[in-house]
Amino acid sequence: MRKFTVVFAALAALFTLVSVPAQAADLGVWTGPKDNVRVSIKSCGDSTCGTVVYASPKAEADARKSGLKTLVGQQLLRDFEPTGNGSMRGKVFVPTLKVTLSGTAEFVDARTMKAKGCVLGGLICKAQTWRRIDVQSTASNDRSAG
């Protein structure tokens, strides 16, 4: 189930898209419950995408075991578009599984979203709550921790 963590981080960022048009330049940086991956969500042409801007050492190690050189810079969210009712749908790349699957995101409020990713036609799903973070204060905390 840890393999879904990256997926949910990306999906969480998508929840802000519900209240922002697909043409929006920047929807912020989002993180999952364990803060091991942070994803920046932005418009990419006619849709929305999410790219990893931070990964913990463990998340990076897991990605390397799957054949990636680095997790940072990977586009995990692709072709996300609003579906109505405060939701979005698109494709999510899961590096640790080496698969792209369908994902949804539901915008709860300006700083909270619920992300869901499923495999096997929806037979196995996992959902998490993600939060939007203040990148400047987080960067300061990262520097002071080291």
Cite the ranges covered by each PLM segment.
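Absolute protein N-terminus
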Residues: M1, A22-D26
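Bacterial N-terminal signal peptides that target proteins for export
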Residues: M1-A10
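C-terminal segment of classical bacterial N-terminal signal peptides
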Residues: L14-A22
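Central antiparallel beta-sheet cores of small beta-barrel/beta-sandwich binding domains
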Residues: D26-L27, P33-S102, V135
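Non-cytosolic beta-sheet module surface loops
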Residues: T31-G32, V119
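Surface-exposed interaction patches
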Residues: R89, K98-A105, A110-T129
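Edge beta-strand at a domain terminus
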Residues: V119-G146
